[in-house]
Structures are given as structure tokens and as C-alpha cells.
Amino acid sequence: MALPDFSMRQLLEAGVHFGHQTHRWNPKMAPYIYGDRNNIHILDLSQTVPLLHNALKIVSDTVARGGRVLFVGTKRQASDIIADAANRSAQYYVNARWLGGMMTNWKTISNSIQRLRKLDELLAGEAQGFTKKERLNLEREREKLDRALGGIKDMGSVPDLMFIIDTNKEAIAIQEAKRLGIPVVAVIDSNCDPDQIDYPIPGNDDAARAIALYCDLIARAALDGIARQQGAMGIDVGAQAEAPVEPALEAPAEGA
């Protein structure tokens, strides 16, 4: 595999260049703005192209070395797209509501994930010993936990990289990433603060077609990273197959 390709035409057709109304802008976005039309800021796609390519490379490199990417997008038009892209690329997501402390208080979140797993086990069977009302309450609790944590249930620990749609809406997620030193890839619209983002992608963060394009490209970059990781593992395994490693590995076990 290779990094996913995209063209300027694709970005234009998806409406990536359309920012917000000029009076809603963040002046820090001035370097990324081409101009305005009918009181709408037009983002400079000649900058978006290389920055998007760089973001895709960061995602692929992170996954290739065994890292985890967390997709974050809780706004209505991003929610389903975010979950689909993360699932398709074997990554993780938050698409309902960002719970304060989701990264910075991982221990508490882990306890909630354990509770979700327990409920999954209980309800996978017949949930014997429970009344109909008790079972209904368990199902409601499970549904609530799954909506909040289902996308990170198997993540294991905090991610190595975060990809964010709408930096204003997900400001708490970005603050937590900063505190933990987790790098952030994010789409920055004309009303955003680019200073908070390690790998910015100037572009529209509201249009469903634009969101779908970003998420598809990021997911494919993650899949490229998985392919590279597996390729590297294949080379290692091949090298080991020719060397007499088995006895060397067994020696410590015998002495233990």
C-alpha cells in the first residue's frame, strides 16, 4: 500500500475551501485564507494540499510503529462518519460526547470500560437471575456506556495521536491532549485557533462531504500504516526463520 492520493479537484468538489462568514473568523487564521466571496472566507487550498499530505504521513507513520489513532468528532454531521472511518481502519473513536477527563483521568475511564465489558458479558447470556425490570435497567446502563465509550473500549490506554473534526467544539479534548503530550491532527476552519494544533489541515469542518473526505483519507493512511507494520514484521519473521533463535529464547526459561 501507499499513502492515499487526493487532488485539488476533490477538495474543491467537497467544498473544503469554504470557510465561515467573514465576521466569525479567527484572525490567527489569516495566513491560511485566500480571500472572501459574498462575505464568506475562502481558504487557501494551495496550503491545504501539502498540510493534508503531511497529516496523512504522520498518521501512517504513527500506526506503522504500532501507535493508536483516536478519531474525535461529536457534531451531528461528523458522528457516523467518524465511527465508520475509525472502525474501517482498526482505530478508535469518540463520536457522542467528550467526557471531561477522558484522557487525563484514564484510570476512572478504564473502570467505566470494565463495567461496560461486564454488562456485555451479563447481557450476552440470558442474564439469568434478573427480573425483567432489572434486565431493562442493565440494558439502559450498557447503552449509555457504549454510546460514550464503545469507540475506545479496546484502546487499552491513551492514544498516540488524535484526529479531530471541529477544534472549537472539541476544545476540551485538545486541552487534554496538550496536557499529556499527545500530538493532534485537526481540520481548522476560518473560525479556529491554529496555534493549538500540531498538524493543521485548513478546511471546512461543517460540510458532510468535506468531513467524509478527510475521514476517508485519514482512515486509508492508517491502513497504510498497518500494512507497513505487517510488512516490517514479515521481514523480521523471515530473518528469524533463518537464524537459530529458538534455543536462545528457551535458555532463560530453563534456568528460571
From Swiss-Prot:
GO terms for biological process: translation. Gene3D superfamilies: Glucose-6-phosphate isomerase like protein, domain 1 (3.40.50.10490), Helix hairpin bin (1.10.287.610). The keyword ATP-binding does not apply. Coiled coil: none annotated. Keywords: Ribonucleoprotein, Ribosomal protein. The keyword Signal does not apply. One of its GO terms (molecular function) is structural constituent of ribosome. One of its GO terms (cellular component) is cytosolic small ribosomal subunit. It comes from the Bacteria. Belongs to the universal ribosomal protein uS2 family. NCBIfam families: rpsB_bact. HAMAP family: Ribosomal_uS2_B (MF_00291_B). PANTHER family: 30S RIBOSOMAL PROTEIN S2 PROKARYOTIC AND ORGANELLAR, SMALL RIBOSOMAL SUBUNIT PROTEIN US2M. This is Small ribosomal subunit protein uS2. It comes from Brucella anthropi (strain ATCC 49188 / DSM 6882 / CCUG 24695 / JCM 21032 / LMG 3331 / NBRC 15819 / NCTC 12168 / Alc 37) (Ochrobactrum anthropi).
